[in-house]
Design a protein with these regions (language model features):
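Short capping/connector residues at structural and topological boundaries
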Residues: 114, 118, 126-129, 242, ...
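Residues immediately flanking
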Residues: 106-107, 234, 314, 375
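Conserved core of the sugar-phosphate nucleotidyltransferase
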Residues: 160-314, 318-322
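Hydrophobic/aromatic beta-strand patches that form the interior of the parallel beta-sheet core
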Residues: 103, 122, 152, 173-175, ...
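Conserved N-terminal catalytic core of the sugar/cofactor nucleotidyltransferase
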Residues: 2-104, 111-119, 123-228, 454, ...
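Left-handed beta-helix
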Residues: 2-101, 247-486
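Conserved short loop/turn motifs at secondary-structure junctions
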Residues: 149-159, 234-237, 366-370, 374
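Short His-Asn-centered micro-motif
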Residues: 124, 134, 153-157, 177, ...
Length: 486
């Protein structure tokens, strides 16, 4: 069976490496690995993509659950801060715009918001989607530098076709990342589901490096003189091209730079930074035992949070991958699909900060971190609290606190219930329990609560609500806490 597995590969270096991995697992697991390879064969994945799948399966079947013990870690301190970097890096950055590519992670569907298409195609106002803001920012820097900065959209199989149909920019590259079968934990075999789309998952954004290399795009960019890539999530519009960071990476001869920001108590889903064996280390929450989550959340011990924005020196990456593949720490992501327990075997691109020489973590302000993960975030982004600039950047000061019932969890429902958007006063608090249709643009001041237990949405025709709690029944709205201005 091992010979059959190795028959999928041609590279002598990969063959030698995989033989070592396969020697570490039993023949029973070889049978399971072969089943995954056969399932993936019709996709014609690159040799690197298949290699990554086999390595991940060998690690998982060998008992690697991706858990990183906190006992061997120490706080990450003394990182350079963007606000304290010399302004002369701006000049270097401006002179280096011709060497820059911008890469956006565009594989997400926004399933937490009920989306069935690319999250980047969600509207943030009637005229702009996330992708429009991204293109506006790239075009701004193209204009400033008079250079055709390449934009690369890393898509999953979920988002590739729809994104390509929605973006006509001539300097945009559409890169398809690998996909792998979901693993049925009951049998170790590939998942069999009622719909084929449910049987697959992207292997995490750590796949970026090998997808770039296997597609040939990495070498193409380097051959064109592109030496630096700025990479960020497409749902984080605060992650824009930054001259000082670009100039710093180049002037300090770094191969890899990760942007981290001071962690808040609300920063839980995502990665924290620490030190391991004298190197920066990325800790995704799923890589930490639940018994240690309370410690992980202590900002005194783990004060920095991963923004998932990185800067890469592309010739260094190309040189590394021409010698051997990267093996990033494993992430075991449990899911339930149609009642079946499965795992997705993934990696995170930020984990490369621990492996690559000349890598560094740079502390950036929260103004570079505004991920939109929920409809609460989307309400705020669509409001007056966030200034959307023509150059694709965003700015904000104080943000409101919003609590929503499940009726608002999906984007389509949100757009139906709040079609005109909401405006907020500084430090406003809004609680919505039950579906409320805001018939007009509404300004929220102070603490406002609207609730009802009716089966159908209730209309609200107010243009302003201030320090009030209202409850609706069949006869209409009733004030429980009067408006303080009355």
């Amino acid at each position: 069976m091992m010979a059959d597995i190795l028959g999928f590969f041609n590279s002598p270096a990969i063959l030698l490496e995989l033989q070592t991995w396969l020697d570490a697992v039993s023949p029973t697991h070889h049978h399971r690995i072969m089943a995954h390879l056969k399932k993936a064969a019709p996709l014609h994945l690159s040799e690197l993509g298949l290699r990554d799948m086999v390595v991940a399966l060998c690690r998982y079947f060998s008992g690697d659950q991706g858990i990183i013990p906190l006992s061997g870690l120490s706080p990450l301190v003394d990182c350079p801060k963007l606000d304290e970097l010399s302004s002369h890096y701006d000049t270097i950055g401006l002179q280096s715009l011709s060497k820059l590519a911008c890469i956006k992670l565009n594989g997400g569907l926004g399933t937490t918001m009920g989306c069935d298409g690319p999250k980047s195609l969600i509207h943030i106002d009637p005229h702009h989607r996330f992708i429009d803001m991204i293109l506006a920012n790239v075009n701004e820097w193209r204009s400033r530098g008079n250079v055709p900065i390449p934009l690369v959209l890393l898509n999953s199989y979920h988002t590739m076709a729809e994104t390509m149909a929605s973006v006509s920019d001539p300097h945009t590259h559409f890169l398809l990342q690998h996909q792998v079968p979901r693993l049925d934990t009951r049998s170790g075999m590939p998942l069999i589901a009622s719909h084929s789309d449910l049987e697959w998952n992207p292997p995490g954004h750590g796949d970026l490096f090998h997808s770039l290399y296997a597609s040939g795009l990495l070498k193409t960019l380097v051959d064109q003189g592109i030496t630096v890539a700025f990479v960020a999530n497409s749902d984080n519009l605060a992650a824009t091209i930054h001259l000082r960071l670009l100039g710093y990476l180049i002037a300090e001869d770094l191969s890899f730079m990760l942007e981290a920001t001071p962690k808040l108590p609300t920063d839980q889903k995502g990665g924290s930074l620490a030190m391991r064996n004298g190197r920066p280390c990325l800790l995704e929450r799923s890589q930490v035992s639940p018994d240690d989550w309370e410690l992980l959340d202590q900002t005194s011990q783990y004060p920095l949070f991963n923004t998932n924005s990185i800067w890469i020196h592309l010739p260094s990456l190309l040189s590394i991958l021409e010698k051997s593949p990267m093996t990033l720490p494993l992430i075991v992501n449990p899911k339930v699909v149609e009642g079946v327990p499965v795992v997705q075997l993934e990696t995170a691109m930020g984990a490369a900060v621990e492996q690559l020489e000349q890598s560094q973590v740079v502390v950036v302000p929260r103004s570079r971190f505004f991920p939109v993960k929920t409809t609460r975030d989307l309400i705020v982004l669509r409001s007056n609290c966030v200034q959307k600039n023509r150059d694709g950047s965003i700015e904000w000061n104080t943000l409101p606190s919003i609590s929503l019932s499940s009726h608002y969890q999906e984007v389509n429902a949100l757009s139906h219930l709040i079609p005109h958007g909401l405006q907020f006063d500084a430090n406003a608090t809004l609680t919505l329990n039950g579906p409320v249709v805001f018939q007009k643009p509404c300004y929220i001041r102070g603490d406002v609560t609207l609730s009802h237990a009716l089966s159908e949405p209730v209309a609200c025709g107010e243009v302003e609500l201030a320090n009030v709690t209202k409850q609706a029944d069949e006869s209409g709205w009733h004030v429980l806490v009067p408006d303080s201005s009355s």
